[in-house]
């Protein structure tokens, strides 16, 4: 028997069977980049700050994500969690470079399931340009 990846999402109202719930481990506040100007309010506590988030904020976010994953599992939904990755490292292309990645907490933002395909949703934040790579790995199993 071959181990094939099965993804099926043709509408928004069928029962949920399998989902990815992110992790807050090593999430970073994005360094200044063009997309942030329009999205970070002037009075935000993030304005002018970047780098790793505080341990307290990561712990609180992980508790919420863990509780959510547990709730889904109790309802019989298969839950995959991304493998933690050090997001406090540079990301670059020949055209640009940013000081750190964002994180893998909001998995739904970067993977769009249409039918039997998982599509990368384009991110305006450069720091999220490679976020999808480690999110798809745990889903390479039969549903």
Predicted regions and their residues:
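A generic, well-ordered mixed alpha/beta core segment in the N-terminal half of proteins
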Residues: 99-135
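Short, glycine/serine-rich, charged loops/turns that create anion-binding
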Residues: 25-26, 125, 142
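General beta-strand structural signal in soluble alpha/beta enzymes
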Residues: 80-83, 120-122, 141
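Surface-exposed loop/turn and secondary-structure junction residues enriched for glycine/proline
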Residues: 16-19, 108, 140
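Single conserved hydrophobic/aromatic residue that forms the stacking wall/gate
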Residues: 134-143
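N-terminal leader/transition segments
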Residues: 1-93, 97
